[in-house]
Amino acid sequence: MFGKKKKKIEISGPSNFEHRVHTGFDPQEQKFTGLPQQWHSLLADTANRPKPMVDPSCITPIQLAPMKTIVRGNKSCKETSINGLLEDFDNISVTRSNSLRKESPPTPDQGAASRIQGHSEENGFITFSQYSSESDTTADYTTEKYRDRSLYGDDLDLYYKSSHAAKQNGHAMKMKHGDAYYPEMKSLKTDLAGFPVDYHTHLDSLRKSSEYGDLRWDYQRASSSSPLDYSFQLTPSRTAGTSRCSKESLAYSESDWGPSLDDYDRRPKSSYLHQTSPQPAMRQRSKSGSGLQEPMMPFGASAFKTHPQGHSYNSYTYPRLSEPTMCIPKVDYDRAQMVFSPPLSGSDTYPRGPTKLPQSQSKAGYSSGSHQYPSGYHKASLYHHPSLQTSSQYISTASYLSSLSISSSTYPPPSWGSSSDQQPSRVSHEQFRAALQLVVSPGDPREYLDNFIKIGEGSTGIVCIATEKHTGKQVAVKKMDLRKQQRRELLFNEVVIMRDYHHDNVVDMYNSYLVGDELWVVMEFLEGGALTDIVTHTRMNEEQIATVCLSVLKALSYLHNQGVIHRDIKSDSILLTSDGRIKLSDFGFCAQVSKEVPKRKSLVGTPYWMAPEVISRLPYGTEVDIWSLGIMVIEMIDGEPPYFNEPPLQAMRRIRDSLPPRVKDLHKVSSMLRGFLDLMLVREPSQRATAQELLGHPFLKLAGPPSCIVPLMRQYRHH
């Protein structure tokens, strides 16, 4: 009471203060202005961008890790608590699917240990999350759903027997059978069911029931004329909660393995493994690229009951996976048995090329020649690059991986197609890392790079910008954790395709490294962002459209001449420099064709941009990129691709069965541009123009210099 009054502490103001960033909010446009670079992809108005998807030829089997429980505040770890959390994710913005310009919110855990598998449907795609791993960070998960058509039926409409009526917006909806455009395609079923779990992963998880107390899966060949007929019996195990599933006895014929498009029709937040077993929904982005050669085996299948929701694209996360393993390599990506060229000479900042192998390793790489491949298995074959020659000093990735998976006595060779229950041979994390080390360069990029700033998060890892110490130049660094990849082998796409193909209109990759258990890809940083920003916020005139098309066609002509199919051409995959130059990116989805493997069948791409033959599961080649470019032209004209207001399944059905799409306002488009579009959007692939032919079209004479794109970037940033 009589004590001295304490002196008030004075805090000085900041010294050397600089106001570098001013962030505001425009009430008229309802948008933030002046955001820092790393905030753009979090708050950008790109929540409606669809995500790409892939054909699940064979999801890499993975080693199980203990499943995690979730504790959120005072909530108990019940199944309902996980499903309740999903309501919160609907309000989180999801950015476009471009892997170099993407952010996504952190992923939640997967739920209680009593669950076997969770799957959700996001943007019409049912995705599965089977296991938890040691880390809480995001991981890539390829929602691959289809197998080679010769194995599982002649069309996409035989995946399941119809068992559930479709619901849309809370009302039951019956769809009429439509006549398919292709004679090979039958009418679509009216009922909707979920996608099957991958055969190998599903069986592997259920056979390990002794560890987790879930289900015991007794399976044997059914007595049937078809070699692909199986009889499955679910029997109860220790977990009482799953005993209700024991009543189900599932017998699948060859037609049951045929994929169905109906699984894409809805976007519910969660779906169920069985009619009585709710599962947590995990949102993840699917990734293209069909990976290594898989065994000729069907997928396991179970009908899934789903709850339809609205059509808005919601946030998604990635499942945490423990160490995945992989099958014998195939020629679906890179060039099967690629010949690695020595480092390029010149003044490149980053030396390119792999390290030379020791003599013993070089010989080991070709030790798999005596292995007997199963029937129908495509043995890796060399794609003859005009500028590359075979050298015994450099070993091929596919050959090396094959030797790893076959020579080890721990992993006996597979006997797929026989009556045995033997699993595909596996490659450990250490073996895979050793194989990847042959492709990347030695050293640590942190020795010459600093100031790493995260600017995005893609389907396989995060993207940072970094500064070169000795020049001050900014580069993009894509960091991918090997242990958190659902399909580790797809990482070779990112490294080898970008390393071997250099063009003025292709994003340049400087180098790649293994830093611990992460693959770091150092590449060109394009300050202008993605074409998606321009398409969604501004309107392009025909000069600007022609300028973009000219650059993209030059890149495609170069890639197609090398036998590379991009398979995901869209505005998200087109990046711009600050001065308006246009470059093609995202090569994780590509495939290689050659004389030995002239066509592809995998369902790969983003639904609205897919060519009809891809959706129809017909063999396809480089022509699919031309169709996708035509859709991207419509995107530049109308601001979005055709059928963008429809769910992916309905859009895919219309692409497959209807006449080619057209722009909304034809009267606003010149006859020259209409003619240009008509050459690309041709249903018959053989009648579709090639990239080289399109480069001579009169419309491209309207193309201006790269500087004509700069005002669009300024206009977008002003918004």
Curated annotation (Swiss-Prot):
Residues 25-448 are annotated as: Linker. It catalyses: L-seryl-[protein] + ATP = O-phospho-L-seryl-[protein] + ADP + H(+); L-threonyl-[protein] + ATP = O-phospho-L-threonyl-[protein] + ADP + H(+). Residues 449-700 form the Protein kinase domain. Residues 1-28, 96-118, 226-245, 253-298, 339-372 are annotated as: Disordered. Highly expressed in brain and eye. Also expressed in adrenal gland, pancreas, prostate and testes. Within the brain, expression is restricted to neurons. Present in brain but not in kidney, lung and spleen (at protein level). Its EC number is 2.7.11.1. This is Serine/threonine-protein kinase PAK 5. Disruption phenotype: Mice are viable and fertile, and show normal development of brain, eye, pancreas and adrenal gland. It comes from Mus musculus (Mouse). The modification Phosphothreonine is found at T107. The active site is at D568.
